[in-house]
Every structure is written in structure tokens, then in C-alpha cells.
From Swiss-Prot:
Function: Forms part of the ribosomal stalk which helps the ribosome interact with GTP-bound translation factors.
Protein name listed in UniProt: Large ribosomal subunit protein uL11
Quaternary data: Part of the ribosomal stalk of the 50S ribosomal subunit. Interacts with L10 and the large rRNA to form the base of the stalk. L10 forms an elongated spine to which L12 dimers bind in a sequential fashion forming a multimeric L10(L12)X complex.
S-S bonds: none
Posttranslational modification: One or more lysine residues are methylated.
Organism: Ruminiclostridium cellulolyticum (strain ATCC 35319 / DSM 5812 / JCM 6584 / H10)
Pfam families on file: Ribosomal_L11, Ribosomal_L11_N
Keyword terms of this UniProt record: Methylation, Ribonucleoprotein, Ribosomal protein, RNA-binding, rRNA-binding
Amino acid sequence: MAKKIAGYVKLQIPAGKATPAPPVGPALGQHGVNIMGFCKEFNERTAKDAGLVIPVVITVYADRSFSFITKTPPAAVLLKKACKIESGSGKPNKDKVAKITMDEVRKIAEQKMPDLNAASVDAATKMIAGTARSMGIVVVE
């Protein structure tokens, strides 16, 4: 029989840098999970993605054990990395902070495809291009 699920915890943690400090410690502590066990396992799984923020969904079971699924980094993080910028524009309609080519947007869309609610890579590319525009990044053909 399957284990009884006590709850889910969704976090965004820098790859390879999970520590028992907030936000990880308090979020897992209230469910009674072994925080160090999670941190070690997460850091091992995400060591290759250093520098990126990794969303993780932790499933906590009634016996206080856990399992977790890592997702692809948020589109905004991937766009900032591709454009080599610190943050998006505060006024995206007026101030443009960078330019990105459609090919680069397509590569990001292909990387994000498993986590996006899109039927095709073209649809995913449009989603990522929209995110770029809302950050003040100009998408050039």
C-alpha cells in the first residue's frame, strides 16, 4: 500500500546550496522532516546546475519520510543568464535592458518543455518570448 501523504512543500532553492537556514529549515521543520537529510540529497542532485535557482516539490509522508522532484529553473532565471543581466527592467514598456535572439529563446523553451503547459516547442517559445518582453528584454528575430 502507498504511504499516506501528509503534505507538499514547494520551494525555490539555489542549486547545490540548500542549508537548514530559512527558507528550507522552517518549511520542512513544521512537517517534522529530517532537514539535513533533505539538504544533503538536494545538494547532491543539483550540484551540476550551480548558479541556477531550482524549484523543488517535496512530498512529506505521514511517517515523516519525504521524496522530492526537482523542476527546471524558472524562465526568468534562464533569460537573465542568457542575457548576462542581474535583473529585469522596472519599467519593461519604457526601459529595455537587453536583447535576445529567437534561437536563444527557442533553446530555453526546449529546456523548459517538461515543465511548461505547452503542446509544442513553438507554443513554448511564444511563452518564453512573452516572459522576456515582460522583463524588458527585446526579442529579435
